[in-house]
């Protein structure tokens, strides 16, 4: 269950299947990083699966709703919410937290550079679920780029159109 005010925060109701798909892969006691967490649509089901989640969000209103949603779903004890810019906070995570077992990165449009930043926080053999916005003809090049960066592409799929010819894509990656 989620509460939110769509006048103040972003929420995509069309990604319900995708959020369930990823949450089902999470094992109890995993350490999961979720930057750009919003009101908690990935955080809450992952925490409910027994994972320990570090969530990062810069929007104060989204943080308020994420906290409320964690309480509403009784998973607040499994979540560390950090209010701040995910790109700034990333440098500090190496100091405070050991490497993560998994990262779920619902990347904002045009911010693909964050994959390199957050993949360094995931342990070798760890999973990364990376979301990006691309045209279909760009996908083969991305797969090659990810694999050259030491990220094995286990799975990828389109998660729906966002503009003419542009889709949101998810890549399930394993850090080598």
Predicted features along the sequence, with ranges:
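Rossmann-like S-adenosyl-L-methionine
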Residues: 1-176
């Amino acid at each position: 269950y989620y509460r939110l005010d769509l006048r103040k925060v972003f929420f995509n109701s069309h990604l319900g299947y995708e959020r369930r798909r990823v949450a089902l892969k999470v094992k109890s006691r995993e350490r999961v990083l979720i930057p750009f967490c919003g009101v908690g649509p990935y955080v809450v089901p992952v925490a409910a699966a027994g994972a320990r989640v570090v969530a990062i969000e810069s929007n104060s209103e989204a943080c308020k709703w994420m906290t409320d949603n964690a309480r509403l779903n009784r998973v607040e004890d499994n979540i560390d919410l950090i209010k701040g810019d995910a790109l700034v906070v990333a440098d500090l995570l190496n100091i405070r937290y050991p490497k993560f077992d998994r990262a779920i990165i619902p990347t904002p449009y045009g911010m693909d550079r964050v994959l390199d930043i957050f993949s360094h926080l995931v342990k070798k053999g760890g999973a990364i679920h990376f979301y990006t916005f691309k045209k279909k003809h760009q996908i083969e090049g991305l797969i090659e780029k990810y694999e050259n960066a030491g990220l094995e592409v286990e799975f990828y799929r389109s998660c729906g159109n966002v503009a003419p010819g542009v889709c949101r894509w998810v890549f399930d990656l394993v850090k080598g």
